Amino acid sequence: MMRQYELVERVQRYKPDVNEALLNKAYVYAMQKHRSQKRASGDPYFSHPLEVAAILTDMHLDEATIAIALLHDTIEDTTATRQEIDQLFGPEIGKLVEGLTKLKKLDLVSKKAVQAENLRKLLLAISEDVRVLLVKLADRLHNMRTLGVMREDKRLRIAEETMDIYAPLAGRMGMQDMREELEELAFRYINPDAWRAVTDRLAELLEKNRGLLQKIETDLSEIFEKNGIKASVKSRQKKPWSVFRKMESKGLSFEQLSDIFGFRVMVDTVQDCYRALGLIHTTWSMVPGRFKDYISTPKQNDYRSIHTTIIGPSRQRIELQIRTREMDEIAEFGVAAHSIYKDRGSANNPHKISTETNAYAWLRQTIEQLSEGDNPEEFLEHTKLELFQDQVFCFTPKGRLIALPRGATPIDFAYAVHTDIGDSCVGAKVNGRIMPLMTELKNGDEVDIIRSKAQVPPAAWESLVATGKARAAIRRATRSAVRKQYSGLGMRILERAFERAGKPFSKDILKPGLPRLARKDVEDVLAAVGRGELPSTDVVKAVYPDYQDTRVTTQNNPAKAGEKGWFNIQNAAGMIFKVPEGGEGAAAKVDPAATTPKPGKRALPIRGTNPDLPVRFAPEGAVPGDRIVGILQPGAGITIYPIQSPALTAYDDQPERWIDVRWDIDDQMSERFPARISVSAINSPGSLAEIAQIAAANDANIHNLSMVRTAPDFTEMIIDVEVWDLKHLNRIISQLKESASVSSAKRVNG
């Protein structure tokens, strides 16, 4: 275990003016607090925070961050308090130690929800101070290094979470060395057989090619030296996880991989990077399509380097990375390499780390999504997806660079520029040409968004976008628009209900009734009434507890809408709302347009349904030509019944659930609808065949036939047929009745 003076010396190597008192005090305090604790391995618990601190010294972090690492488990696992740490080390260190503690104190139902909420809390904490991320990643790295002592199920859970969240997060924040080590450790426990096989093959390959690698390294160094470029060249081998992932994703065998070895060239200046590139390309043949310039266009995590692939001395492909030494440090340590020292000689002023980086820009965008939705697991999936995605770089007409994941569309671009631009997007010009909004953007595209103040993002856009930010914003806008529609409908229903009750009505009048209705605000009440979840009479009674409902309930028939017992209200947009007399809730919105179909699928041919609610037919079915009614099923959408269905009697006393609907059939209609016929046939040879022939002659499809009762001289059966409409069905029934083999035939409802 590292001694106190050894820790101080490690920091002094890169920061000679280190605050030794702070480090010594944190070391002694943490050691005393953890002195009676052991890890699962049997080692003293203090060895863990000490190793976390050591990892951070390898990243050349300041003494304040090292102190936070030493203290990070004290509040959670010992008698230490926030107040005590504030007094000894200052409130800022105390705040960060407490913040790291809170990340662990979660009590949710599903593992996925725990992981999602952990990620949310971590990202929010990072947004306040990036040192939370640095300590958290170092903490996870040491836990992964010592994971072997855990139970197998726990090892697997921690390894999967590391692979899904912590490794890609380290990469997204530019910390490539840490990302690679986390991936390798996780791979070892997630798929030990594959890890062992790939590791063994890589060791064999390295031994076989050691001489060749040394030759290429020497050749490169000599070329640079002859041309006056001060450069260091270092060979590197792909890590086992990187190799395995490529084999899996591209379906390759180990022997088919051609770029397992690579070289890193480090020079002093950007100019030398391009000079070195020119020398390499004039000495060896380059592989077309494998050149990437991340110096002129850095990655979103601030990674900068030139990548190229050449054909080496033995005709094998060799990948080279050319960068300055400063770029190399940023590539290894990411945001930690952006530290700006502001030492004022006090522990109360810990050193800050710059947030003016591309990695932080990604982080800020991700944080914005936290306010766009309330489903943590959904947020987790979107964020995990974006952590792994490759990028394309596009430009606004004014030259602003916008980084997007591969597969992004102009809609993603619009939301990346600003949420308001995304919400008002109606079209896009890509490189000066108007293109569909589903167009996949490519590197270098210039995108000009066409906007309209009247635009509301349609829900269908969600399937066209690749970024979590766009997806969350579309959901928010869709929810807001739907809620606004329902609120407007609820307002009109309540106005009528209060009028019938002889009571005054306004939004403010509803406020005293909120506790009785268990609703958070007035808009929530209005939307619930509009959706049919909350009867209007319940609202009247909540506001006026002495109100008595004296209505006489009768069977309400939506087919008689416009007659006594019903009234219509129409808004400025032409939407008609049919409401039962007495104000007992809404039937539903009657939209002049049919329900919007999903892509590639025609909607049900029904007018009068809310486009935001699912619609289905009742089991007994209805066919065009039937008089139909919709019944609002709270939480399950709308069910369509034929008006003669006996099942409707169950809703006689719930008029607020009845919806006036009608068919929306055109000449191009090619759909068939299920109907049921009860047939009593004479029990003689060939009678069943004759029934089938009648159906076939009328172009009807029998998809089910069941015998109900069989007697010596007749058979009763139920036939399910698919027909075009009511006329088609009646023609079949009429011909069945005329058949000598059939004694009776009639339609069955229910």
UniProtKB/Swiss-Prot annotation:
Q: Does the keyword ATP-binding apply?
A: yes
Q: Where is the HD domain?
A: 45-144
What does UniProt give as the signal peptide span? Answer: none
Which is one GO molecular function term here?
A: GTP binding
What's any GO biological process attached to this entry?
response to starvation
| One GO cellular component, as annotated | plasma membrane
Q: Which SMART domains match?
A: HDc, RelA_SpoT
Q: Which UniProt keywords apply?
A: ATP-binding, GTP-binding, Kinase, Nucleotide-binding, Transferase
Query: What does the record give as EC number?
Result: 2.7.6.5
Question: What chemistry does it catalyse, as a reaction equation?
Answer: GTP + ATP = guanosine 3'-diphosphate 5'-triphosphate + AMP
Pfam entry (one):
RelA_SpoT
Domain ACT residues, every copy: 676-750
Q: Which Gene3D superfamilies match?
A: 3.10.20.30, 3.30.70.260, Beta Polymerase, domain 2 (3.30.460.10), Hypothetical protein af1432 (1.10.3210.10)
Q: What is this protein's function?
A: Functions as a (p)ppGpp synthase. In eubacteria ppGpp (guanosine 3'-diphosphate 5'-diphosphate) is a mediator of the stringent response that coordinates a variety of cellular activities in response to changes in nutritional abundance. It is necessary for persistence in mice, essential for intracellular growth of Brucella and required for expression of the type IV secretion system VirB and therefore plays a role in adaptation of Brucella to its intracellular host environment.
- Name the protein family: Belongs to the RelA/SpoT family.
| Name of the protein | GTP pyrophosphokinase rsh
Source species: Brucella melitensis biotype 1 (strain ATCC 23456 / CCUG 17765 / NCTC 10094 / 16M)
Lineage runs: Bacteria, Pseudomonadati, Pseudomonadota, Alphaproteobacteria, Hyphomicrobiales
